A protein has these predicted regions:
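Glycine-rich, aromatic-flanked loop segments that form ligand/cofactor-binding clefts
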Residues: 99, 105-141
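Shared catalytic-loop signature of beta/alpha-barrel
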Residues: 214, 220, 231-250, 254-351, ...
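Metal- or metallocofactor-binding catalytic centers and their adjacent structured scaffolds
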Residues: 32, 36-115, 391
């Protein structure tokens, strides 16, 4: 199957705010090959990612992603990996390339699965898919009372695990954060799994992060996610060396396999979180999942946007029965909610399951998302390199 066309669609809510909510805009990718159409989603700035696909070549190691993709054959998983390797070489100085390629790569897996009549996870070598325990992924409220109500709501909906992140954490004093953690625990109940995400707020300040450990332990948190910058491996290792009962989590900032492995080997995290929309797609995420198994680290998806992205993020570890928890975007913006025609919902036991339909198993509702489409055009020296294509 030859890659005939790659289309990018920049979607956005009418108003974008400064809250740490990545579902306010989206970049969908539609790929046509061999009579099949596949969809993917980049977890990145839409306009910058489109530019990385079409930009003029700067030199031999800084080429647009487009040059390595269009016209290529995609008849096997090995072909997808081969294209990814070419991009790593030809676009090594184009730092946005991995994010752009991520969405294209997902779409290629979607196409390959549809062509073979199998879900992506089977193409990755899994015989069966294991159910995952979804944790409702939420932002902290502006105050503990607001946080309490948010967590109570998801508990009432049947979720036994919840993650609270960003918001005011790390911006005030230790007591302020302790009150937020306690509110999360109160809302979830004694038996729920509480996860805390600091959103990299402490940079590489180990002492500031460590000052929160007693409060996290008191709240019974399972992990402390991204206390530091995504590449501050020494800071992660220093905090892990204090042997807290709470394990560290990180890895969503990895935009290649090497960064993810470094987080495991040098950052000493107990949970490695990979975003297929950033790392280069499903293939590199599967490599990290296998590496995590070998290193005794728990693999977890990172997804805070649509259920198209959720399906893609589940594929790399679908068959890993011992890696049971899954990030579940609980309160995304309307844009993200409307991308998928059929959302991935918990079953009667509270588990979610990766789709078993061919490809990613998620149909994109082009009519529903048309109202979010942002018309964009990139013109260089009088030549149009990109113009928003038609959705249907």
């Amino acid at each position: 199957m030859k890659i005939d066309a790659v289309d990018f669609f920049y979607l956005a809510m009418p108003q974008i705010t400064t809250e740490g909510d990545g579902s306010q805009d989206a970049l969908l990718v539609r790929v046509a090959a061999g009579g099949q159409v596949g969809w993917g989603e980049c977890e990145a700035s839409p306009l910058v990612s489109i530019a990385a696909y079409v930009c003029p070549m700067s030199h031999g190691a800084c080429r647009p992603v487009k040059d390595s993709v269009e016209g290529q054959n995609v008849d096997s998983p090995a072909e997808i990996a081969r294209i990814g390797a070419v991009i790593q070489w030809d676009s090594m100085d184009l730092l946005q390339a991995a994010h752009t390629w991520s969405g294209v790569e997902m779409a290629l897996w979607d196409i390959l699965g549809k062509a073979r009549g199998e879900p992506v996870w089977k193409l990755l070598g899994y015989k069966k898919a294991a159910g995952k325990v979804p944790y409702a992924s939420l932002l902290f409220g502006d105050n503990p009372d607001e946080t309490l109500e948010r967590v109570k709501t998801v508990r009432q909906k049947g979720f036994t695990a919840a993650k609270l992140g960003w918001g005011p954490i790390g911006r005030g004093n230790v007591k302020d954060d302790a009150d937020q953690f306690a509110a999360g625990r109160e809302g979830l109940g004694k038996d729920g799994m509480l996860l805390i995400d600091a959103g990299q707020i402490f940079g590489e300040n180990v002492e500031s992060a460590a000052a929160r450990l007693p409060a996290l332990q008191s709240a019974g948190a399972t992990w402390f996610e991204e206390p530091f910058h995504g590449s501050a491996y020494e800071a992660y290792a220093a905090l892990a060396a204090r042997k807290p009962s709470i394990r560290l989590a990180g890895g969503e900032a990895a935009h290649n396999v090497f960064m993810a492995k470094h987080m495991i080997d040098y950052g000493k995290v107990g949970f490695i979180q990979i975003d297929c929309g950033r790392i280069g797609g499903i293939s590199p995420a599967k490599i990290v999942a296998d590496y995590a198994v070998a290193k005794g680290v728990t693999y977890v998806n990172h997804t805070f946007t649509s259920h198209l992205a959720l399906s893609a993020s589940l594929q790399p570890y679908a068959g890993l029965a011992d890696h049971r928890i899954c990030e579940y975007p609980m309160a995304p913006k309307a844009l993200a909610r409307e991308i998928a025609r059929t959302p991935i919902l918990p079953d009667r036991e509270g588990l979610i399951h990766v789709p078993d339909a061919p490809g990613l198993g998620v149909a994109v509702d082009t009519k529903a998302i048309a109202k979010y489409l942002v018309e964009a055009e990139i013109v260089v020296a009088g030549r149009t390199l990109y113009k928003t294509p038609k959705l249907a």
